[in-house]
């Protein structure tokens, strides 16, 4: 009887440990609404703002595939947080579909964020705190360096230095996309350690062959 109990207990531990995700760091990714809509194959249903807003907070690995769709409890509506999420984390392509966007982000990424973010409430509250209270808002960081969304051509170094000035001199990850002959800054990722306690240099820079690789100059923002 003791032998059977031990086997069952060991099996349960094995199942639980196998469902836990392994990750090395977090990517806090924000997208510039106008550039996103310009590059999106499907037209955005709402006029975009000249702002960076949250795309997601993603547990990530330095080598191999990032964890996705981990075992989790059923998603629940987060009505108390929705007024803030609607501002900082909208579904840019269709704001009437915000809830579906948040749900997808939770199931795909947030479900794998334990132990740093052990549940859905903690996950969304942390994003709000990072963006608002901790001022990890890319629009604000660029503005502090007098880089405003004026549709001007910027150099890669100019953008990188501005962001590094607001993130303890850590290197961000940038995504650009060429639309109608112009290269636009589409996304900025700020990277954090696995406990979300400090900025780190973003691992895994985009290869030069990537369609999102940013050139050294003539980046419109």
UniProtKB/Swiss-Prot annotation:
It catalyses: a ribonucleotidyl-ribonucleotide-RNA + H2O = a 3'-end 3'-phospho-ribonucleotide-RNA + a 5'-end dephospho-ribonucleoside-RNA + H(+). GO terms for cellular component: extracellular region. The active site is at 55 (proton donor), 105, 109 (proton acceptor). Belongs to the RNase T2 family. Keywords: Disulfide bond, Endonuclease, Glycoprotein, Hydrolase, Lyase, Nuclease, Secreted, Signal. RNA binds at residues 31, 55, 91-92, 101, 104-105, 108-109. N-linked core structure at Asn-91, Asn-137, and Asn-153 contains xylose and at Asn-195 contains xylose and fucose. It is an enzyme of class 4 (lyase). It is found in: Secreted, Extracellular space. Its EC number is 4.6.1.19. The keyword Lyase applies. Glycans are attached at residues 91, 137, 153, 195. This is Ribonuclease S-2. InterPro entries: Ribonuclease_T2_eukaryotic, RNase_T2-like, RNase_T2-like_sf, RNase_T2_His_AS_1. The keyword Membrane does not apply. One of its GO terms (biological process) is RNA catabolic process.
């Amino acid at each position: 009887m003791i032998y059977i109990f031990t086997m069952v207990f060991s099996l349960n531990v094995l199942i639980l440990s196998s469902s836990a995700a392994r990750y090395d760091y977090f990517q806090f990714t924000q997208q510039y609404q106008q550039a996103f809509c310009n590059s999106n194959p499907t037209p955005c249903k709402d006029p975009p703002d000249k702002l960076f807003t949250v795309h997601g907070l993603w547990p990530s690995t330095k080598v191999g595939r990032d964890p996705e769709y981990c075992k989790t409890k059923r998603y629940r509506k987060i009505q108390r947080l929705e007024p803030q999420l609607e501002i900082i984390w909208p579904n840019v392509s269709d704001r009437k579909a915000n809830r579906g966007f948040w749900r997808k982000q939770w199931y795909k990424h947030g479900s794998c964020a334990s132990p740093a973010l052990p549940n859905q409430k903690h996950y969304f509250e942390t994003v709000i705190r990072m963006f608002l209270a901790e001022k990890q808002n890319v629009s604000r960081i660029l503005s502090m360096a007098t880089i405003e969304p004026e549709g001007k051509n910027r150099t890669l170094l100019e953008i990188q230095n501005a962001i590094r000035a607001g993130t303890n001199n850590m290197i961000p990850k940038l995504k650009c996309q060429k639309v109608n002959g112009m290269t636009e800054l589409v996304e900025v990722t700020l990277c954090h350690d696995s406990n979300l306690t400090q900025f780190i240099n973003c691992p895994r820079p985009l290869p030069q062959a990537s369609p999102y690789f940013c050139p050294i100059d003539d980046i419109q923002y």
